[in-house]
Amino acid sequence: MKCVILAAGYAVRMYPLTCNYPKSLLVVDRKPILSHLVESVREFVSDITVVTNHKFHEVLSIWSRNYPEVSLVDDKTTCDAGRLGALVDLSLAIQPGSDYIVMASDNYLDFPLDSFIRYYQEVQTSCVMYHEIEDPDRLRRTAVISVSDSVVTSFTEKPECPCSTLAVPPFYIYTADDCAKLSDVISSGCNLDNLGSFAEWLHSRSTIHAFKMPGTCIDISDLYC
């Protein structure tokens, strides 16, 4: 298994805090959130790729000196208006023939990822994590799923009318066969900015299992804004 962490966004909603500093390096629990993510997964994967934009490539290069297992991919963008979108950024890092754990770089987990990875190893399909949220406003800002026998039966990114209280944060595991479908997703006309658009497209074409999170996921913007 390999890992991709997406850190190429510009976090304009958090300006001026993130105008000249990457959101992924904001500190939670005494260290950058990106450090938490790398440390939670590195013993389970053979390779970790962080996709960054060109504007923050240098500062992330400095950060990565403490993590020799991490390689950076520069998507060459320099501003929010020129961003490629999460799915295109993901395609820059995905290599054929490997399964991947894929994460956004702006969510903090208060539990280790080993249980999620072990679940994937048991079911041998692509997987998402979920937790329960009762607040309809929060549900409209995330991905929401329905589940039957632990299999995803519906998946909607940022639904106007949420079909359940099962919210999916941006942590996914994709099989090698499903990773090979990423180019089809990109050409399908889906919203390239939403990392969850891949799973949303995929769930009706491939089996995706849902893993109930054993802890909490916190969007870093909720801590700083």
Residue ranges of predicted features:
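Active-site glycine-centered loops adjacent to acidic/histidine catalytic or metal-binding residues
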Residues: 9, 106, 132, 222
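Catalytic-core segments of class I nucleotidyltransferases/pyrophosphorylases
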Residues: 117-121, 151-225
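A residue-level structural signature of the nucleotidyltransferase/glycosyltransferase Rossmann-like core
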Residues: 100, 108, 144, 170-171, ...
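A structural signal for short hydrophobic beta-strand segments in well-ordered beta-sheet cores
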Residues: 25, 144-147, 210
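Short alpha-helical oligomerization interface
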Residues: 19-23
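Anionic-ligand binding region
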Residues: 128-162
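Conserved N-terminal catalytic core of the sugar/cofactor nucleotidyltransferase
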Residues: 2-5, 13, 27, 31-108, ...
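Conserved donor-nucleotide/metal-binding helix-loop-beta segment in metal-dependent transferases, i.e.
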Residues: 111-139
